[in-house]
Amino acid sequence: MSLKATVTASDEGTVIHLAGELDMSTVEALRQAVVAELHDAPARVIVDLGELTFCDSLGLGTLLVLTRTARSQRTLLVLRRPSPFFLRMVEVAGVGAALTISF
């Protein structure tokens, strides 16, 4: 299983494009990518989930922790283009209010 995290800059803020699977073997790559971007204290970091093919509960938990970490640094972490599966997982877990999701 693999995850590719590509960072680009846009008018909206820093965008981290994820492609592949987010699970216990790849969450560290996501964590490192987001923490590296938070170092510069941007107003917003967007995590683009449009090419994410799988996410398990550890992946969702990592996104929740990273959202809290970003908020503590006054950065908004936005999850963009989630799949229906990801949205269902968020709903079942009851964590939608803790995440900022953009379509």
What do these predicted regions represent?
Residues M1-F54, V65-F103:
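STAS-like cytosolic regulatory interaction modules
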